[in-house]
Amino acid sequence: MLDSIIKILFGSKHERDIKAMLPILHKINEKEAWALSLSEEEFKAKTDEFRERYQKGESLDSFIPEAFALAREAARRILGERPYDVQILGSLVLHSGKIVEMKTGEGKTLMSVAAAYLNSLTGKGVHIVTVNDYLAERDADWMRPVYSYLGVSVGVILSNMENDARRIEYNCDITYGTNNEFGFDYLRDNMQMRLKDKTQREFSFAIVDEIDSILIDEARTPLIISGAAEDDTQRFFEVDRLIGQLKEVEKNPETGEYPNELEGEEVIGDYTIDEKSKRVSFTDSGMLHIQDILQRQGLIKSGNLFDEENFEYIHYFTQSVRAHVLFHIDVDYVIQDGQVQIVDEFTGRVLEGRRYSDGLHQAIEAKEHIKIAQRNRTLATITFQNFFRMYDKLSGMTGTADTEAVEFTKIYNLDVVVIPTNLPVARKDEHDVIYLNENDKFEALCTEISEAYKRGQPVLVGTVSIEKSELISKLLTKRGVRHEVLNAKNHEREALIIAEAGAKGSVTIATNMAGRGTDIKLGGSPEMRAKKRTGTNPNPDYYEKVLAEEYAKWQSDYNEVKELGGLYVIGTERHESRRIDNQLRGRSGRQGDPGRSKFFLSLDDDLMRLFGGENLKNVMSKIGMRAGEPIEHPWINKSIEKAQTKVENRNFDIRKHLLEYDDVLNEQRSFIYEQRNAILEDENLIERIYATLEEFISEKFDEYSSSSKAEKEERARLIKDIFREKFSYTLTEEDFANIDKKNHEEEINEFVEHFTKELKEKEALAGKENLNMFIRYQYLQAIDKKWLDHLENLESLREAVYLRSYGQKNPLTEYKLEGFDIFYSMLDDIRIEIASRLVRVQISTEEEAHASRQMRSIQGNAQHNSMGSFSGSGHGMGPTALSARSRPENAQVVRTVPKVGRNDPCPCGSGKKYKYCCGKNG
């Protein structure tokens, strides 16, 4: 293998990448005999030595030859598998922070061991990211003995774990988990009220398995933690029963295009749809029709559709039309246990726990006449794009990445390196065959499957939806072809079905579920057959005996299937992405095995219909092609690839555009989370309050003093209101006269002194630690509340700026400018809110509290709080409440009562400030 790699001369970028790593590979191979001579104790001792050297300043790169040799030898001793040179090269690529493209069956899981081991030596933790819990747990269990032999701990994060268990797993040297769990834990950590409740460490190094699936396919789907919002479920039912009265705009029969309403062309219908982007737009007449429908139904009591109280009906109608016209059962979603479950278009799997946002999920539930779940409010959100960009070093592996190399470079600054296979690929990829219509296509491919079935060649049929997989199943049943169906409805049998997909005579119809994380062996799986015979928890000796028998039988089956040509992969439709097609092809021809692949297409397929089918249809008409006749030519393949490239470029632009918007939110989120963490760690929050309050007041006074004469009166009123309502502090005309002269340092100092004195009094009664706990809770509560409101404001802004493009304005620029304006406004609100809460909280003596309790009892107040707590403006103490044990003697916190501020007019009626009158000696 090494000799064949050395022969690579100047060639493609990938060949040059490989050539540059060969000297390091030589050094690793030279250390193999040294590693072979070490005992298990010496392996662990070497790991400790590496850690110590790293802490003293040596780089990880200086350990590569020895560390990789140790990892390779540990795998050989524990698993009986010695990583090939190509796997070592792949691990070098991972360590360098790049993406490895390695074909299916070449051992990506084993390839990651050396890179993960080397980077675990930093003590900062390594995250290995998989697409589901099953793979995370399987890979962790499989590789844990290897890492343990090296003296490295391994953890795994699963969806059903509690916080304490997660923290333990994250503190391991290497942690396996899914992209969802890592992302959600980040969001949950930044919602915690106590530092000790956080689970994750810093984001140092991540290896992402199936990285193209996570960073490309799921890039447009943000992670969202949500809570209950207002209940508007009845509106979805109301609108759903009315939606049948609306009609799609009639298209021009010659061009297949909608008439242009802006150019005065006649429009017949209420709405237009864009299947590519799944958008719905109402015409002017459609809007009036909706208004008329709502008025006749009595749903609009007064005014018109565009009045503020009625305008949201447009949103309900939009989502309802989308649900009926653009989202289809057994294609986009399935119904299981009375719930709408989303089907991943790329994997064919049910996305458990995921819901369409913005009311679309509720609209689909109304369409399907099942119980509508209440809409949720976003509490925290992040995209995978911005989550994974937080890692100091990011790498990944997949069987298909090269087609998206440009996007990986531009968005993530990740290079893609293609690693050659250990053995040459022997699969034969045939030209596509294309038919005029779908019926002809299905008839032809069922004939092809039947012929392969008769000769015993295993067949894997790839479909794009559950609906199509079930249709082909019915057609094959009529022909007497025994087969298995694998889709989101029967995913629990996935392991068993895939294990036998390479057996002689097997026919497997699968959605894209069969495209990832699976390894189809020719002749079937002897391990699965042995487990089936021995049952669960068999006697080890008996299991080994049965396994040996199955292996002997499998060897004969394997040779027979090889003679038949290996696994025959048949695609029933081209996907929008070439990667998905390549994944399907990659099920066949693993590790030098023979194989065959072929796609059967028609002009009715979505890709052909939406992206370039008209050109092909015209060509086929000119050459006199008839129904039932196929066409097979390299030109067809090029034309289809061109259509796919067009879609890929379009989808890349969409993802890039979404990221540009999300970067605005990401910058703001990072700032808020940094502030939150600082507050969790700060043991002297009073000083932070003083500083932020002084800064805020100074800004407000500066705004007043620098404003024009016409603006001054309004600004003075606003500042007075803030000080009176939030701080119980009155600013006089004399104060504003000084501020106007830009001589407001005295006023600032006076206010801060007043505020400081009040807090010192409260600190003396409550105790510094308890007051700090209270301030922390109130601070975090204020941040969280304002941040949630801000997320909603940004979402509304994003929808609003979209329309400004019609006014020749750049929506993104508008979003950035206004987004940061409302962000800074939110920061002001937080500063005011926390200071206001501290001003209003009251602390009284035990005697006063006792008298107050007696008075409440006399008045018949049934509410009783057995735990003394801070309270102010209705804000409870929450988890940091002062208990009787922690409270200083004779001190108790009770509910807020009206009080006179030192700068308020004295209640005696003298006209003087309270501090200069009756409060002089207070």
From Swiss-Prot:
Binding residues annotated for ATP, in chain numbering = 87, 105-109, 519
Q: Under which EC number(s) is this enzyme classified?
A: 7.4.2.8
Q: What class of enzyme is it?
A: translocase
Which sequence ranges form a coiled-coil region, renumbered to this chain?
none
Main localisation, per the record? Answer: membrane
Question: Which SMART domains does UniProt cross-reference here?
Answer: SecA_DEAD, SecA_PP_bind
For this protein, what does the record note about how its cofactor is bound? May bind 1 zinc ion per subunit.
- Which Pfam families does the entry link to? P-loop_SecA, SEC-C, SecA_DEAD, SecA_PP_bind, SecA_SW
Which Gene Ontology terms of cellular component type are present?
cell envelope Sec protein transport complex; cytosol; plasma membrane
Asked whether the keyword Cell membrane is assigned, the reply is yes
Where is the protein situated, by its record's location annotation?
Cell inner membrane; Cytoplasm
Q: Which UniProt keywords apply?
A: ATP-binding, Cell inner membrane, Cell membrane, Cytoplasm, Membrane, Metal-binding, Nucleotide-binding, Protein transport, Translocase, Translocation, Transport, Zinc
Spell out the residue ranges making up region: Disordered.
Answer: 850-891
Question: Which coenzyme or cofactor does it need?
Answer: Zn(2+)
Subunit info here reads: Monomer and homodimer. Part of the essential Sec protein translocation apparatus which comprises SecA, SecYEG and auxiliary proteins SecDF. Other proteins may also be involved.
**Reported function:** Part of the Sec protein translocase complex. Interacts with the SecYEG preprotein conducting channel. Has a central role in coupling the hydrolysis of ATP to the transfer of proteins into and across the cell membrane, serving as an ATP-driven molecular motor driving the stepwise translocation of polypeptide chains across the membrane.
The family annotation for this protein states: Belongs to the SecA family.
Xref: NCBIfam families = PRK12904.1, secA
Q: What is this protein called?
A: Protein translocase subunit SecA
